[in-house]
Amino acid sequence: MIEKDDWRLVDQTRYLMHIPLKKAVYRRPSPNWDHDHCEFCWDTFSEYDGDLHEGYCTIDETYWICPECFADFKEMFHWTLAEKE
């Protein structure tokens, strides 16, 4: 069980509590925006070698969560996985 004082917790409950997520491959949203970060550990998602290429995100792909942080926080945040389209 993750402790409430885990270093990765920085007010994400405001916008990530009880929301559906989907598993997705990261695709750059625009030519000028080539990466995102895990909302918890700050690991980088991008299409570049050495970065994360897939993980979990909000349905609109605004917020990304790496697989490790998803596993660590899924119970605390009560996430559900959306059905694949």
Question: What are these regions, as identified by a protein language model?
Answer:
Residues M1, Y26, C57-T58, F70-D72:
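Intrinsically disordered, low-complexity regions enriched in Ser/Pro/Gly/Gln/His and often acidic
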Residues M1-V25:
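N-terminal alpha-helical interaction blocks
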Residues E61-K84:
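Short metal-binding segments enriched for Cys and/or His
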